[in-house]
Amino acid sequence: MSDNIISFDHVTFTYPDSPRPALSDLSFAIERGSWTALIGHNGSGKSTVSKLINGLLAPDDLDKSSITVDGVKLGADTVWEVREKVGIVFQNPDNQFVGATVSDDVAFGLENRAVPRPEMLKIVAQAVADVGMADYADSEPSNLSGGQKQRVAIAGILAVKPQVIILDESTSMLDPEGKEQILDLVRKIKEDNNLTVISITHDLEEAAGADQVLVLDDGQLLDQGKPEEIFPKVEMLKRIGLDIPFVYRLKQLLKERGIVLPDEIDDDEKLVQSLWQLNSKM
């Protein structure tokens, strides 16, 4: 039996003055310790999901729907308990900075939790080191690069020891190298701390590395499954305006020419190796 850390049960949410729901009767579950990618076009409801998970928003009718995080049903009396379990890294880290230095910013969440100062200093030093920013502990966040700022934002979340990290378009403003560095960092942190990661993105290359993919379209769950189950559905993804990852585009083109590669070919390295093996047999 799977251990689900997050579950949505028939969740509908409508923004004030909006003529239609942003989410409509949405149900899904996320397994503890997994990496889930939530994909969809702009306006599909992805970021609304992240705000509901963290209690920043509430479903239209809690009597007809429920959101559960780490065994706690989200409600007015449990919202702060849930928020301690979930950390969000947003698209623009500048909007999250509150401290004069990197260390001050990382300490902010601990101060709100009244963590004793000696313990706080140890936690901050460890969190800053874990994201490779120890040399910048006394720097002003405004002087950092985009990738460095995201590292500091991740350190601030890591310091308060959440169960879930949500990357809400967190790499969309970074160059390809910076993006991959941040994703590699989060993968390591996830494994070292047994965290659950939710990546909200329209970048399917990023989503290809997830354990599970949820596809949203106009506030509804269009499909879900492993990347190798979702990405071959080229027409569905094109219809909702998403670009297919290169590996899956090439596999589709080869398939149309009678060359079928194994399902487990899901990244560039495996693709190159498979093509070399195929070439050696010709």
Swiss-Prot record:
ATP binds at G40, H41, N42, G43, S44, G45, K46, S47. It holds the Pfam family ABC_tran. One of its GO terms (molecular function) is ATP binding. It is found in: Cell membrane. SUPFAM superfamilies: P-loop containing nucleoside triphosphate hydrolases. It is a peripheral membrane protein. Its EC number is 7.-.-.-. InterPro entries: AAA+_ATPase, ABC_transporter-like_ATP-bd, ABC_transporter-like_CS, ABC_transpr_CbiO/EcfA_su, ECF_ABC_transporter_ATP-bd, EcfA_1, P-loop_NTPase. Residues 6-243 form the ABC transporter domain. Keywords: ATP-binding, Cell membrane, Membrane, Nucleotide-binding, Translocase, Transport. GO terms for cellular component: ATP-binding cassette (ABC) transporter complex. The keyword Thylakoid does not apply. The keyword Translocase applies. Belongs to the ABC transporter superfamily. Energy-coupling factor EcfA family. ATP-binding (A) component of a common energy-coupling factor (ECF) ABC-transporter complex. Unlike classic ABC transporters this ECF transporter provides the energy necessary to transport a number of different substrates. PANTHER family: ENERGY-COUPLING FACTOR TRANSPORTER ATP-BINDING PROTEIN ECFA1, HEAVY METAL TRANSPORTER. Forms a stable energy-coupling factor (ECF) transporter complex composed of 2 membrane-embedded substrate-binding proteins (S component), 2 ATP-binding proteins (A component) and 2 transmembrane proteins (T component). This is Energy-coupling factor transporter ATP-binding protein EcfA1. It comes from Lactobacillus delbrueckii subsp. bulgaricus (strain ATCC 11842 / DSM 20081 / BCRC 10696 / JCM 1002 / NBRC 13953 / NCIMB 11778 / NCTC 12712 / WDCM 00102 / Lb 14).
